[in-house]
Amino acid sequence: MRYSLLKILTEGLTGNRGWPPVWREPEPKTDYDVVIVGAGGHGLATAYYLAKEFGITNVAVLEKGWLGSGNIGRNTTIIRSNYLLPGNEPFYEFSMKLWEGLEQDFNYNAMVSQRGVLNLGHSDAQRDAFARRGNAMRLAGSDAVLLDTEAVREMCPFLDFDNARFPIKGGLWQPRGGTVRHDAVAWGYARGADSRGVDIIQNCEVTGFQIENGICRGVETTRGKIRAKKVAVCVAGSSGRVMEKAGMRLPIESHVLQAFVSEGLKPVIPGVITFGAGHFYVSQSDKGGLVFGGDLDGYNSYAQRGNLPVVEDVCEGGMAIMPMIGRARLLRMWGGIMDMSMDGSPFIDKTDIGGLYFNGGWCYGGFKATPASGYCYAHLLARDEPHPTAAAYRLDRFRRGAMIDEKGQGAQPNLH
């Protein structure tokens, strides 16, 4: 079924009795061309583009829990392409272009809202770094505007310009950045993949890999063995545990990242704002709640919940730039498991085991990368060669000395 205004009006007048299920609940077959482990944003996007762009429809997406129960529904919904390094910026700009046409592409309202992303600067050195980053973005075909203090004040008069501990010296603005309804992204990709014949199998945990003579021939699951010509893993923070079942160790650590939403407030924040002297980022949802987050909890964890010191630290960051939120009450908070790589950049690559592919290490950048990650992973699976924009995301880059350290923090995952 194709969604349209006419269909909505028709169903509204007839009691909404004609809507079919958005996707099927199929039983797993015994063999597929491709088995994708993980029905999050990246896994579903990969299945969608395999079917749509490359004509491979004999695909299964296996999910331990329910569709979209991982990080795709736990992030702060921000999309942007304001990266510096040549290994990153073209990829994220490709993702931004896919975001811009996403809703028309899969005929689903993902609520893409390009209201801009503003990174605040608080020193002369930071302003110079923003100028460098903005120039790199524009060279890669993206958009960037360097703002002075008065331009930031005109855009966001509610910020603390007069008494802030870290004075606002300006900012870097990406007008095309913004937010997207994260659950709708999962549902839209699932609907699009399912309509093209992909089997999305929920409550089906992968318990092992069928490896014969160094080649992966399929997976073992709680619902039986499934053979496959290719097995593609994209399970975010569970990457280490899943790939360990294939005898692999990854240059990745798992950390918990918390996110928060306040009670509903009147519209005040025009887009996304980030604090440059700490780690705090905030946007406002359609319901009026402030959606914000900050740093990792700092210790290894597989729990989808965090601890109170980070709550205090994040709220202090918010108060530092806009004290007006001090009387707003927190509505809820949650956590997601981040797959933090050693240089802060991801992997989309073949493994040393034939027929086994890996997508992970996304750190903070997983949600905004969803369309490009799915497209590039599908390209790799279909053609057995990397997509040009993801060619740098190789598993062997540490051995080759080809790190992509966007923040320059070194090999400490919880700092990226």
Indicate where each model-derived feature is located:
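Short beta-strand to alpha-helix junction loop
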Residues: P90-E93, L120-A129, L172-R191, I201, ...
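Glycine-rich FAD pyrophosphate-binding loop
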Residues: A51-I72
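C-terminal catalytic lobe of FAD-dependent flavoproteins
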Residues: M319-H416
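Helical element adjacent to the flavin cofactor pocket in flavoenzyme catalytic cores
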Residues: L172-K230
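Active-site substrate-recognition segment that forms the wall
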Residues: Y48-K52, T77-I79, Y108-G116, I215, ...
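Dinucleotide-binding Rossmann-like beta1-alpha1 core, especially the glycine-rich loop
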Residues: T76-F158, P309, G317-M319
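Extreme N-terminal leader/targeting segments of oxidoreductases
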Residues: M1-V34, K52-I56
